[in-house]
Amino acid sequence: MTRLSEILDQMTTVLNDLKTVMDAEQQQLSVGQINGSQLQRITEEKSSLLATLDYLEQQRRLEQNAQRSANDDIAERWQAITEKTQHLRDLNQHNGWLLEGQIERNQQALEVLKPHQEPTLYGADGQTSVSHRGGKKISI
């Protein structure tokens, strides 16, 4: 087996691992309540796999430039890697949309909770005002 074949096999393995991690990410983002620590672990694992894939891609280019002989087996492996990469790009985009939806729902929940954060009191003028905790209002 040539060095290029080994690199392509390693890339395939990393892409399969990345698919598993991205499926887990999608599952986390699809549930009603996200486990933050679990999502962070998944994100770190995904980043590590992407860094490994980037390194392998650099090695593949160096090796391929050195060989420059077209080989059917190599071409088939590269085609499979290209297809997996395109699928993972689409999956990552979908996960990004799910994450944006979660962020939007969290923002809406915060907006609902915000008015209830501090009690409303009546001021000397009879109008409602929000109390300021931890100090007096000073005007100069």
UniProtKB/Swiss-Prot annotation:
SUPFAM superfamilies: FlgN-like (SSF140566). Signal peptide: none annotated. One of its GO terms (biological process) is bacterial-type flagellum assembly. It is found in: Cytoplasm. One of its GO terms (cellular component) is cytoplasm. Coiled coil: none annotated. Keywords: Bacterial flagellum biogenesis, Cytoplasm. The keyword Cytoplasm applies. Residues 119-140 are annotated as: Disordered. The keyword Zinc does not apply. Disulfide bonds: none annotated. Pfam families: FlgN. Transmembrane segments: none annotated. Required for the efficient initiation of filament assembly. Belongs to the FlgN family. This is Flagella synthesis protein FlgN. The gene is flgN.
